[in-house]
Regions:
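Short loop/turn motifs at secondary-structure junctions and domain boundaries
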Residues: 32-34
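Short, charged, surface-exposed secondary-structure boundary motifs
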Residues: 10-15, 38-40, 60
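Signature of lipid phosphatidyltransferase scaffolds
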Residues: 37, 44-98
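Structural recognition of the beta-strand scaffold that forms the well-ordered cores
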Residues: 1-5, 29-30, 42, 48-51, ...
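Primarily the HKD phosphodiesterase
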Residues: 1-27
């Protein structure tokens, strides 16, 4: 599951990327409940959290000074998952657009 910022993903390349994600069968929602949906988190296997400033973009990978950390801790993963589910509940299901 992925939650993305609604306002920051209206450009052509963002829509193309979101369509690709949706076509792959990955659940995707857009969130406009906040000025910016700025979370950058991966929660894996209910016990590993990756977070940091890294935007999961080519620019972040090749040009910017970024950071990311992975922590294996079930309690932390649970807290991050609760935060994610809150954002998920506020999001709107993304519909493919061509």
């Amino acid at each position: 599951k992925i939650v993305l910022d609604y306002k920051g993903n209206k450009g052509k390349s963002s829509i193309a990327a979101m369509n690709l994600i949706a076509q792959a069968g990955i659940s995707l929602r857009t969130d406009d409940a906040y000025a910016i949906q700025h979370d950058k988190v991966i929660i894996a296997d209910d016990e590993t959290v990756q977070t940091g400033s890294f935007n999961y973009s080519s620019s972040a990978d090749k040009r910017n000074s970024e950071n990311a950390i992975s922590i294996k801790h079930k309690g932390l993963a649970k807290a991050y998952n609760e935060h994610f589910l809150n954002r998920w509940s506020k999001g709107k299901e993304y519909k493919l657009s061509y």
